[in-house]
Structure formats: structure tokens, C-alpha cells
Amino acid sequence: MTQGPLTTEAGAPVADNQNSETAGVGGPVLVQDQLLLEKLAHFNRERIPERVVHARGAGAYGTFTLTRDVSRWTRAAFLSEVGKRTETFLRFSTVAGSLGAADAVRDPRGWALKFYTEEGNYDLVGNNTPVFFIKDAIKFPDFIHTQKRDPYTGSQEADNVWDFWGLSPESTHQVTWLFGDRGIPASYRHMNGYGSHTYQWNNEAGEVFWVKYHFKTDQGIKNLTQDEANRLAGEDPDSHQRDLREAIERGDFPTWTVQVQIMPAADAAGYRFNPFDLTKVWPHEDYPPVEIGTLELNRNPENIFAEVEQSIFSPAHFVPGIGPSPDKMLQGRLFAYGDAHRYRVGINADHLPVNRPHATEARTHSRDGFLYDGRHKGAKNYEPNSFGGPVQTDRPLWQPTPVTGVTGDHAAPSHAEDDDFTQAGDLYRLMSEDEKGRLIDNLSGFIAKVSRDDIAERAIGNFRRADEDFGKRLEAAVQALRG
């Protein structure tokens, strides 16, 4: 902000910002005091709707640097040349908590990454876990309702949470991850990020590959125990935000090594489980991660509301050479994110500095709406026309996905190893005895709060189906807590 006298929103100088205008000394306030009315009216409208999920967050700008030639797999321009640097903005978040919630809680962390490429903005909207609780977006509103406050009690209820998870056995893998050591990262800098979904890459020849993104923290994985998190949430609820901001301020820029797993399109139909199932990971022995670049965060936002709260991300923001997969959860998110931001920030949210393309120009025939900035000046607002302006390229961003059968409410195609428990059991068996002990403690402490035996027993039963030892130890721990 430039130096000079205080002004009204219209730019007129303010004579007195300490006293309202009144009818005489001690008299009633006058409606002609437009500064008072302007300040109160603006104050009443400072808040916009918070995100229905991922409300609590922090963000920073940075740079993605390509370190490997991947042109054999994708024609995306920002992935076309070793050493190429692309500006980014990354927003971290928790999922269930409101805008004023604490950072140090047991909850997945959102990982929303915007690449400002010369072909438009590419948004990769994932989490700090490679899997999720459900595999079809039609269940997402129901799932989130269980994570939020109960409409009667006004609190998050253990009954609701475990009732849904128990009746949705596909959640077993993600819940095992969440209640393990990585369920509460020590900071945003000390956790990995994942695209989670499967995405399409396509090259200049039109060949298709399915990919999964991994961002491995170079700071090392650090986590909090439940007791440490409880203390920190009370003493410093802004701990994650503060840690990220202060690290960048002192020049300790956090970095991540970027990897992708790559599956030739021909492998998908015959793979041992559905490769588009968001509740499963691709084993590294089947598709080893390929290192392709580095991500560095090196600049803090100057205004949290303008750049973090008003930032928008959508999994539908693709660039040439990258596209969606048949992942049913991803397909729902392609609509939901844009719709949420149009409601929350407005139809012209893409015009805000943090959201608009930085390395190219958006050229559309869309016009007007709240806070339209007049960027198109007098250009024609329709196409085709006889006066010039942007026209279509006739080249899709991604390759079409072959389909068979008829329309209907179908489950995903069946594969030989599509069960909901094997990978949860594999994760449990990878843990050390100490890690298993903490997992059991974390789970049992929450399940013991459930008021109905059938809900608790169903939840425990899912973990037993993942691993017999897992279920037995958890059942004993819950019984001990419940007396």
C-alpha cells in the first residue's frame, strides 16, 4: 500500500477515524457519517463461505524443476525439457476441521498443487496419503457428514464415524494409515504428498499411460504421537502454518522429490486389481516409481485471505498431455471442486491473481458476472464470428477411454484381487511392533467411545479380516478400555 493519508474506499481523505459523527455532544449518531456506515457494512461482509472440506489451510509459492526427460510418456509442455522450471502454488490443509480448528490433529492433510504452465494452469489436488476412504464420489457427502458435527449434538460423534467406516469396508486401508504413525504429521514440511488418483498421460504419438504421483519430502518424515498432538493443539493451534511460514522466512526452503508410477494403458484391463480404485496403491515391484523432478517452496503469500483463502483448485484443470482416468471418485471431483469454488468465491474466481494463469493468458468468450474485471474489453463474446479472436485447436488434451456395455448404475469392473482388506493387512504387517502398538492404542481409544456394541464389533471385524492378529489385539484393547 502506498503512503499517504487514510481514505475511504472511494479514495476521499478521512478527517477523523476515531469518533463517529453525532448530533451535538453526546447526541445520536448521524446517518450522514458515511465512513462509519462504510466500515460497518464492509466488516459485515468480510467473510466468505469456508470450504466445506479442507477449510483449515496454509500455502506457499514455489518452483517445480524437471530433472528427467518424460516426453516418451507425456506431451505436456512443462514436462518437456530437463531443467525446465515452472512456478507453483501449494495449499496444505486438514480435511474435517473448520477454519478455526487446530493444525495438529489426526486427519488427512490436503495437498493441492497448482502448476502455472505455458499451456494453462494444471491443478493436482491430492492428499498426504496415497489412498482414500471411499472409491465412488456418490458416497462422499455421506462420508463427510460423519466427519463433521452431528446435527443434533453439534459435536463429532464416534458412533457416526465408526458406523460409516464399519459399513464401508473399503475404508479399512485408509483408516489403518490414518491411525498409524503418519496420521498426525509434525508439520507440513515433514510429510509426503500424493496425487492419490490415477491420471492419464498421453504422448505426441497418442499413446496412453496411467500414472500416479508421489512427492517425497526431503526433510524426512516426522510425526506426532497422540499425546504430543493433544498438547500442541492446545498450546499452538497454528503450529503447522507457523512452521511453514517461518521456515520460508529464514530461507530454509522445503523441498520434495517428485516421482511417478507409470502403467502402460494395455496393462489396466488385466491387472490383478482395479488400477483406478482410490482405496488401493500400486505395488512398487509392479510399477517402480520414476524420479522426474523436484518441488521447492520459497515464497510466502503476502495476504492470507487473498492468496490462500481465495485460492481455488480443481482436478478438472488439465493441460495438453494430461487427463482423467475412469476413477469414479476422481470423476465426481471433476465437477464438485469447480462448483464449490463458484459458490464460495464467485464465478470470476479464476480472475484473481493467485488463480489466473501466470505463464499464458486465459482467452474465453465468457463474460460478466460478479467482480468481472473487464479483461476482454470490447472483443466479441461469441464464437464462431467474423471478427477474429480465440478459436478451438481441434486437438483434445487427453485421449479417449474405450468403454463397453450400456449405461446404468454399475460397480467398477471386477478384477481378481479387488478385495477391501488385503492392502490394509499388508500395511499392518509392514509395521514394527512399536508401530503396531501405537496403531492399536490410537484405534482402540476412539472405538471405545462408540456407544453401540454392534457398531464397534463391525469396525473391529473389518480389521480382523485384514489381519487376524490386528483384529484380536484391537478387540482386546477396546474391551480393556470399556471394562
Curated annotation (Swiss-Prot):
Active-site feature positions: H54, N127
Q: Which UniProt keywords apply?
A: Heme, Hydrogen peroxide, Iron, Metal-binding, Oxidoreductase, Peroxidase
Any one GO MF annotation of this record? metal ion binding
Q: In which residues is heme bound?
A: Y337
**What are its E.C. numbers?**
1.11.1.-
Annotated spans, Disordered: 1-24
Taxonomically, the superkingdom here is: Bacteria
Q: Which GO terms describe its cellular component?
A: cytoplasm
Catalytic activity entry: 2 H2O2 = O2 + 2 H2O
Q: Which GO terms describe its biological process?
A: hydrogen peroxide catabolic process; response to hydrogen peroxide
Which SMART domains did the record assign? Catalase
| Homology family | Belongs to the catalase family.
Q: Which PANTHER family match?
A: CATALASE
This one is known as Bromoperoxidase-catalase
What species is given as this protein's source? Streptomyces venezuelae (strain ATCC 10712 / CBS 650.69 / DSM 40230 / JCM 4526 / NBRC 13096 / PD 04745)
